[in-house]
Every structure is written in structure tokens, then in C-alpha cells.
Amino acid sequence: MSVRIFHPTVAPFVQQAARAIHEAGHLESYVTGIRCDPTSRVQRCAIAAARLVRYDLGRQLRRRTVTEVPADRVASYPLGEYLRLAVGRLDRDGRATDFVWEHTEHHFDRRVAAGLHRGLSGVYAFEHASLATITRARALGLPVAYDMPAPESTFTQAILDRETAQFPELATPWHRWTAAREARRIARRHAEFRAASVVIAASEFTRRSFAPAGLDPAKVRVVPYGAPPVAALDLAVQGGQPDHAPLTLLWAGTFSVRKGAHYVLDAWRTGELGRHARLLVFGAVALPDRVVLPLPPGIELRGSVPRDELMEHYRTSDALLFPTLCDGFGMVATEAWSRGLPVITTDHAGAADLLRPGNNGLLIRAGDSAAIADNVRWCLDHRTELRAMRESAHATAAAWQWRNYRGRLTEVLREAGLFSS
């Protein structure tokens, strides 16, 4: 009774799924791309070679550390990910990186498929990275759990197409490149979905996106992602800025079209929000300079920072601004709640399943700069009420930890027959 789980990355939700299977006593292996291994001579040599071109490969490898399952259960097929990193270092607009990503992900899938055998009791797969493996597993009579972190791709692409049609200045060569290839990628995801025994989604928002595309929502089970360990309650409640200081909002993650960044810029410009509020943006900027510049007063682009530093900024900020147009969950929300930070988000965020408006955050319309401005002004005028949300925000994270996610996922996999002999 053993399950093989595979994904080219070591993302937190992937590792937590692997840990759930391991804790249930059914993990045969977790197959991934690059896995940080300080004992590896190859990795040490690669790090040294990268220094010659002033590239901190060691930092990239440390971000790919597997922490949730024993090392002897982890298998690594790293060449594709190394190639993607190398190309990404030289790529100016993302198209070459996207090309390499697609082809190396398919190669990874084929390698995993080739290693399947009848001694397994099931396979845990992820979207777009698993068609060959799912096909092989079903031929062997193995049940397959298929994890879809994001909403159905036709739905997502329609949102992006609408935004670039309404705001042509948002379009980039990367957007045009990926849009031209999306039909075949959608077909691949649909084939994976239909062949799977059970589909795992992180939110009701994601589950609802499937039926309009002709995909059966009856096979979908919703298992929300867990929150990180919570800060001490007194530290969380006492966080934020004093009332005499400017309101400080935080943005975590890519500053992009899909996340609604262009609406934030418009809200700051037209509403002159920078007079009394700051927005600290932590993450890469994926909007064209012609959209971002000149940067509105009050918005500060801080770039990417180490996780510990970001978590402290969650604690010392007044609210998280997460006006996404389409997000299967949005782990930035649970990260924020774990530090007592109220969340301002939309009904197009899967994490809104856990949001109680006026209690642990605020719910706004997606794609509406006026709604963003109105809610920022509400925060400015109601600092006491906003601060009072911190205790409820902390309680939200404490009530649904990763252990709760793993427990629910284990139940789903058992019901789907992946743990049967």
C-alpha cells in the first residue's frame, strides 16, 4: 500500500500533501525536480561555477529544500529545473523561460510515468505535469488523485484576455506568447482531470470554475490550504502601526495583472491615497513600466525578501491588500492571518472561503479600483475597528493549520481508494 506523489517543485502545498501521505503510512516516494542537498558534490560544484558569473545559485537551491518528508523518500530529476534557471537568468521577457518550462515539465512527467509499477496503491498528481503518468497509472489499474491548485484554465484565460482588451497597455510579449499556447495547455489539463479518480481543489471558487468548462464537479473535493504556525497572540494583537502613523498596507507576491495590481495603481492615483496611506509591495513586478511609472506616491516597491522578514512585515502592517482577479487560494491570506493581519481581498480569491467580512478582513469586488479606494479610506477612518480585527484574524489561522489540511486530505485519499491494498 504505497502512493507516489510527484511535482517538479518543492512548493509548500506539494510538500504538505506528501507529508499527509507519509503520516498516513503510505508514502512510497515523493518525486521532484531540484532538491537542495548540501552533501551533493554536483550541487557544490554548480554553486561555485555560478559564482564566477555572479549568480547566487546557492540561494536558489536553499529555496528548494524538502523539509516535510524524510530524505530517503525523495527522488530528484533536476536537469530540467537547472535548465529553466539558466535560461531564466538570460531571458528578458519570459518567453524562453516559458518554452523551457513547458517542455521540461512534459519530460519530467514522462520520466515519472516510466517508473510506475503495479506494486503501488495509487498516484498523487498535479495539474499540467502529469498526463503521461496518469495515463500509465490508469492502464495499471491504479487510482489517481489529481491536485488542481488554480481555477479552470479557460476561466482564468478569459479574465486575462478581458483585462488586456480593456487595457491594451497591459499586454506584453509574454502575454501574447502564452495566450497563443493556452489552448493546447488547457486541453492537456482537461485530459488529466477527466482521467483522474478524484480531484483536489483548495477552494469552492476553484471547484465552481470546472462545470462551465464541461468538467464534472462531482469528482472534486475541496481541501483548503493550512496556515503557518501562528505568532503569539499578544504579539499579533499588538501589531500594526500606531494611529498617528500613516496607514501601512502590505502586498505579498507578484505585482501582476492577475493579482489586480493595475487596479491598485489606479486607485492610488485617482484617489490620492498616498497622502495618508503606504503600500509596501514585496515581490516581483510583472507589469510593464509604462503602467507602473511614474509610481504613485505612497507605493513602495521593496522586491523579494527572505520569508522571516516578510512574516515580520505581516505583523507590523495594518492590513494585507490582496485584490486578486483570480486565485485558487492565496496562501498570502493565511500567512497574514497567522500574524494577526486583517485581509482585504475579493470573492475571486479561494481564501475568501475563510474570510468573515468585518471580522477578520474586508471583501471587495474584483476588478474595481473604486472599491479598493473606498476600502482603504474605510481603514483610514476606522483604525480602531481595523485593529480589533487582529484577534479574529489570528484565530482564523489557528483554527485551520496545515495539520488540519493533512487530516482532511488523508480522509479524501482513503475514500478515493489510494490507501487500499
Region spans (language model):
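Acceptor-binding helix/loop patch of EC 2.4 sugar-transfer enzymes
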Residues: 46, 77-100, 140-187
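Short alpha-helical donor nucleotide-sugar binding micro-motif in glycosyltransferases
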Residues: 193, 312-317
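Conserved donor-binding/catalytic core segment of Leloir-type glycosyltransferases
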Residues: 236, 240-259, 265-269, 280
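Conserved acidic donor-binding segment of nucleotide-sugar-dependent glycosyltransferases
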Residues: 357-358, 362-368, 378-383
